[in-house]
Regions:
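Aromatic-glycine hotspot motif
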Residues: 1-195
Length: 195
């Protein structure tokens, strides 16, 4: 359901990367369904002063995914120069599995939002959705560009937590879990809105 990377549509991918692309498609569709039929006031409605609106949940994901994808792209470019091959399926280590699990919905604990991920309030659902899908399209392009690399061996510095380094493969799984976490949060806002 990508909005448009034609190059991406014509190339086959390993199963693990195809699964991530399929998840991005499902996430895009979930986001579309969440905002469809909501007025701008409903997209920006917050159940409490400290809670996020549906729009803020999606804007946060778009911002975080975009910043993270940019950091991943830098690591992949460097790996392409150094030719870290052959490719192996994504296999996070114990820390990677733990980190992915911490991101999953429903949240087990609240996490502090990095400055770059604090969403603006009062945007239209259409504008938020466009930015969200554009961030996913950037990620789709990156996945295709990295399809021949061993994503377990390419490490990068997390742009939000500078001391944290982990593999590009783990980061792709973290992005999916983080997206599910905040889509779950947005659904909870919709449920609260109907009460």
């Amino acid at each position: 359901m990508s909005t448009g990377n034609p190059k991406a549509l014509n190339q086959s991918l390993p199963d693990d990367l195809q699964s991530i692309l399929n998840e991005l498609d499902r996430t895009d569709e979930d986001a579309r369904q969440l905002v469809s039929g909501l007025s701008e006031a409903q997209v920006n409605w917050r159940p409490s002063p400290t809670a996020w609106s549906v729009g803020q949940c999606l804007a946060h994901l778009g911002q975080m995914d975009s910043v993270l994808t940019s950091a991943l792209r830098t690591a992949v470019r460097q790996a392409n120069k150094n030719s870290l091959m052959p490719r192996k399926p994504i296999q996070p280590g114990w820390f990677g599995r733990w980190f992915v699990n911490q991101m999953e919905a429903p949240p087990r604990r609240k996490m502090k939002t990095p400055r770059q991920g604090i969403p603006e309030a009062h945007k239209s659902g259409e504008e938020i959705l466009r930015a969200f899908i554009a961030a996913h399209d950037e990620l789709r392009s990156l996945i295709h560009d990295a399809r021949d690399l061993d994503l377990n061996r390419i490490r990068f510095r997390n742009p939000f937590i500078g001391l944290l380094r982990y593999s590009v493969g783990t980061a792709l799984l973290v992005i999916g879990a983080h997206d599910r976490r905040h889509l779950w949060q947005a659904r909870q806002v919709c449920i609260a809105m109907k009460r």
